[in-house]
Amino acid sequence: MSYRTRFGKDNSACDSGNAVEGSGSSKGPNEVSNDFDHEIAQLTKHRSRPHQLLSQDMPGKSRLLVSTMKMLVGRESNHSGRGRFSSADGCHVLSRYLPINGPWGVDQSTSPAYVSQFSNDGLFFVAGFQGGHIRIYNVDKGWKVQKDILTKSLRWTITDTSLSPDQRYLVYASMTPIVNIVNVGSSMTESLANVTEIHEGLDFSVGGDEDEFGIFSVRFSTDGRELVAASRDASIYVYDLQANKVNLRIPAHSSDVNTVCFADETGHLIYSGSDDNLCKVWDRRCFNHKGQPAGVLMGHLEGVTFIDSRGDGRYFISNGKDQTTQLWDIRKMSSRAMYSPRLRDHDWDYRWMEYPAHAKTLKHPNDQSLATYRGHGVLRTLIRCYLSPAYSTGQKYIYTGSSDHCVYIYDLVTGAQVARLNHHEGPVRDCSWHPLYPMLVSSSWDGTIARWEFPGDDQVPTLERPRARRKERLL
């Protein structure tokens, strides 16, 4: 059965407006007030607000949630005068269908899964494993393996992958300054590095620098001409693919840079997050080589593990080792970092220690974030978080992996935990929501790639819990 048919089904439970759950949901101790009236809240609501003629029960009174049946009747009756759903109408319907049913198995490996992402159009899915395998699955063809890549120059693990906008090339990074690029548009399924296909190495070291450093994060620009990378040497690198060289190195932070991304389609703004607890904004149009950012955002009490941009050059979210996800508006940034107090009285290592209980409720005295979301765990590895897709949800949710083996979904505006997906036997380092359909895929250190979908199909989930590992590995 096609996804279009499956996800066209109605479900009265989703029309009730109640929170749904994979294995539990709750309000949680999140710092988002009921009257959260920042512009981002209004923008998010507007993206999923139905046409006023469809949402009115009586003159002058608007319902917060309109049933799917009423929306469809209104569309067929052409109440809006457009003869179709607007993007906001579509989001109003689709955003209530959460991918909480399952899971079904996509793949199982003896090696921990580190990265997993859908392509921009949702046709392909990329998964990377610590043992050196990267697999690209064709989603529309029953998750058939389109490309099976055995990597080279691997040190410890695959830290990140990125698929080019035209979906012809894939880059993968490791704990070395070499990023490899592979032609994934070729007809050959098996891609053994420099045996069946060439994996070209892109050297991010500059100026004869002999120091070895690892790369934690790498991303293609929207036009596919550049790569931006975050490294262990506290720097950000921009690589020009046409010139085949690094054209910019920014000494960005005072500690490891764990995450970096372009803020929008222009490529002018770059966001970065580091173990120095700071998020920084870089504007390449007015950049000077002294490494001065356009601004600094404070709020995390521990290192930043991941950043995801809303894509508008203004808002983004970040995961932190202080066990929080935070929402940011770059218009609140400072020109420099103020004093960051030490709020724990002993050394703490997130890779093998639990987060101190007393620190879970602490707040940065100079917190510039708009909202804070708690409930998930950011331990053992660089856990990733994302905004839900614009097309189907209007980016009204935040979802994140977790060191407690689950995936958490929060309402961006209310802060409520609306779902917790519980299956894995190891930390969920990465997860990805399909850009068009209510489908989410999680990847875990238990080696499992699991698929979650909207309830409504008669299929029974096929994935059994994996056996617990004797030893948990660390990054």
Curated annotation (Swiss-Prot):
User: From which domain of life does this come?
Assistant: Eukaryota
State the name under which the record lists this protein. Answer: LEC14B homolog
UniProt xrefs under PANTHER family: DDB1- AND CUL4-ASSOCIATED FACTOR 11
Q: Where are the WD repeats?
A: 211-240, 252-283, 299-329, 375-411, 423-453
Q: Does the keyword Repeat apply?
A: yes
Q: Which family does it belong to?
A: Belongs to the WD repeat LEC14B family.
GO CC annotations on file? Cul4-RING E3 ubiquitin ligase complex
Provide the residue span(s) of the region labelled Disordered.
1-34
Q: Which SMART domains match?
A: WD40
**What keywords were assigned to this record?**
Repeat, WD repeat
Query: What does the entry give for GO biological process?
Result: proteasome-mediated ubiquitin-dependent protein catabolic process
Which residues fall in a compositionally biased region of kind Polar residues?
23-33
Please indicate if the UniProt record lists DNA-binding as a keyword: no
Concerning InterPro entries, the annotation shows: DCAF (IPR051859), DCAF11/LEC14B (IPR017399), WD40/YVTN_repeat-like_dom_sf (IPR015943), WD40_repeat_dom_sf (IPR036322), WD40_rpt (IPR001680)
